[in-house]
Structures are given as structure tokens and as C-alpha cells.
Amino acid sequence: MTDPTSIKHQTTLTSGTSADFTQAGEPFALFAEWFAEASKSEPNDPNAMALSTVDADGLPDVRMVLMKGYDADGFVFYSHKASQKGQELAANPKAALLFHWKSLRRQVRIRGLVTPVTDAEADAYFATRPKQAQLGAWASKQSQPLESRFAFEQAIAKVATQYIIGEVPRPPGWSGWRITPVRMEFWHDRPFRLHDRIEFRREAAGQPWTKVRMYP
């Protein structure tokens, strides 16, 4: 095991804009700016985000998912309703997200309420997925035990015979969720761990944001 005391402390600031992000007055515009920069600098998946939910016993779960859209209403991702995350969100529609862009030494933390996307939204996104991914969505019983990789490949092949010609429809148990933030925190690395942290807070969607500077 690596001795954490042997790791050299980072004392220089690397990538990122020189603009003072602490002057931002609204979080979504700032997120858009940071995400655009991350899209240019991250080696892969700048839209990857850690999604945290809580089960019936209050035990948290976290996993990486891909953000598939965002706007002033929130951040959207897709998955199976019967998955562990889907069941936990159905029982407790609150979640936290974390974007970590290592190339920029930045992270964005988000907390908020979760609502399902509309069928029209889910259909539109599903239609953009590669056909093999669409077939996989039909074949997968996400979060359930799987006998073997071969069994999964057989299930995909079986589904494929049903959709040799034409479009693959969205499975009824596959959809998306939108996380509408009530908290958005922007963190940027600074030398000697004297980082910058700005949090935007509001009581509910549609309410005005309050900006607070936080100790690192």
C-alpha cells in the first residue's frame, strides 16, 4: 500500500481559465463554460459523473454514469428503471452528482431532486444510440446476477433476430431521469491546498440563487 505521506504535494496550478470564476452570478452558465473547457482537455468522457443515491436502509450507493444533456431544468442521464439506481430513485427521488475534471483540476458537486424524463425525451435519445447498444438495453436485466458473459451475448443475439430490419424501439423499462439542482458547488485547485470553492444555493427550482464562498 502506498504511504500517503510519501506523495509529493501539488504546489502549482495547472490547466484552467485565468478568469475569476468566483464572480459568476449564475451556476448554469458557469457550468457550461467549465464543461466546454473540459470537453477540450479531458482524454475521455468529460460528461462522466458520479451519481449517488440512497437505499431503503439509508446506505449510499455511487456509480459513474454519463450525462446526456443539461439545461436550466437540470442534468439528464438514462438507464433501466429496474436497476438498483432506478429503484432507489423511485423510493427516494433525491440524488447527488459529481463531475471531476482532472485535466483542469476542477470539480462540480450537485445536489437536487429527481424526476423522470418524458417518454418523448427518452424515445428521442434512445433513437440516437448505436443499434448494438439498443439491443443490449433489451437484453440486459441490469443489476441482476448474470450466469456468464456468453449468456448475455446469447440474449443479445436473440433480441437481434427480432429487429433485423427497421428501428429498435425503446424498452418500456428503460428511461431517463433529470436532476434539478438546489445546490451547485464549483471547486478549483489552488497551490498549497488553498482552493477556491463557490456554492450556489436555492430553496427550490425556480427560486433565486444565493452564492456563498466556502472555506477550502
UniProtKB/Swiss-Prot annotation:
GO terms, biological process: pyridoxine biosynthetic process
Protein residues bound to substrate: 68, 125, 129, 193-195
The keyword Nucleotide-binding is assigned to this record: no
PROSITE patterns assigned to the protein according to its UniProt record, in alphabetical order: PYRIDOX_OXIDASE
GO molecular function: FMN binding; pyridoxamine phosphate oxidase activity
Domain of life: Bacteria
Pathway stated in the Swiss-Prot or TrEMBL entry: Cofactor metabolism; pyridoxal 5'-phosphate salvage; pyridoxal 5'-phosphate from pyridoxamine 5'-phosphate: step 1/1; Cofactor metabolism; pyridoxal 5'-phosphate salvage; pyridoxal 5'-phosphate from pyridoxine 5'-phosphate: step 1/1
InterPro entries per the UniProt record, alphabetical: Pyridox_Oxase, Pyridox_Oxase_CS, Pyridox_Oxase_N, Pyridoxamine_oxidase_dimer_C, Split_barrel_FMN-bd
EC number assigned by the record: 1.4.3.5
Binding positions (FMN): 63-68, 78-79, 85, 107, 142-143, 187, 197
Cofactor remark from the record: Binds 1 FMN per subunit.
Swiss-Prot/TrEMBL keywords: Flavoprotein, FMN, Oxidoreductase, Pyridoxine biosynthesis
Cofactor requirement: FMN
Biological function: Catalyzes the oxidation of either pyridoxine 5'-phosphate (PNP) or pyridoxamine 5'-phosphate (PMP) into pyridoxal 5'-phosphate (PLP).
UniProt family annotation: Belongs to the pyridoxamine 5'-phosphate oxidase family.
Subunit description: Homodimer.
Protein name: Pyridoxine/pyridoxamine 5'-phosphate oxidase
Species: Bradyrhizobium sp. (strain ORS 278)
Gene field: pdxH
